[in-house]
UniProtKB/Swiss-Prot annotation:
PTM comment: Is synthesized initially as an inactive proenzyme, which is activated by self-cleavage at a specific serine bond to produce a beta-subunit with a hydroxyl group at its C-terminus and an alpha-subunit with a pyruvoyl group at its N-terminus.
PANTHER family referenced in this protein's UniProt entry, alphabetically: ASPARTATE 1-DECARBOXYLASE
Signal peptide bounds: none
UniProt subcellular location: Cytoplasm
Residues the record lists as binding substrate: 57, 73-75
Designated name of the protein: Aspartate 1-decarboxylase
Reactions accelerated catalytically: L-aspartate + H(+) = beta-alanine + CO2
One Gene Ontology biological process: alanine biosynthetic process
CDD domains, A to Z: Asp_decarbox
Cofactor(s) listed in the protein's UniProt record: pyruvate
Entry's Gene Ontology molecular function annotations: aspartate 1-decarboxylase activity
Main location: cytoplasm
Length: 137
């Protein structure tokens, strides 16, 4: 049996641009892609914290060190520059693989610079007033 598990997550990234007339996808800074274990063309889910919309698209590699989080194509109707988003990739694992799998969690600041890396899915952004997801009722 395969289980679908979280593989990579960029938490609370700020959307830098949205272009309705660009070929559909999400452009992500290559540094963030590496940290979250994402590859060009990989399917990701994008959760818009600002308005609650969720969408599925694929990744395009953005300029390294630029902080770019660009929403392209039809998804630009659901996400606007300045919105906070969570970008999530999943992987299918056997039970044996699941036992040793560690997700890649990337926390970023308002400029999409990496502030912390980890594998705890419930850990809040360091230095924020967020509560751990593990502590919620």
């Amino acid at each position: 049996m395969l289980r679908t598990m979280l593989n990579g997550k960029i938490h609370r990234a700020t959307v830098t641009h949205a272009d309705l007339h660009y070929v559909g996808s999400i452009t992500i800074d290559a540094d963030l892609m590496d940290a979250a274990n994402l590859v060009d063309g990989e399917q990701v889910h994008v959760v818009n914290i600002t308005n609650g919309h969720r969408l599925v698209t694929y990744v395009l590699t953005g300029e390294r060190g630029s902080g770019v989080i660009g929403i392209n194509g039809a998804a630009a109707r659901l996400v606007a520059p300045g919105d906070l988003v969570i970008i999530i990739s999943y992987v299918q694992l056997t039970e044996a693989e699941r036992a040793t799998h560690r997700p890649h969690v990337v926390h970023v600041d308002a400029n999409n610079r990496i502030v912390a890396l980890g594998d705890d899915l419930a850990e809040p952004v360091p230095g924020s007033d967020q509560k751990s997801g593990a502590l919620l009722p």
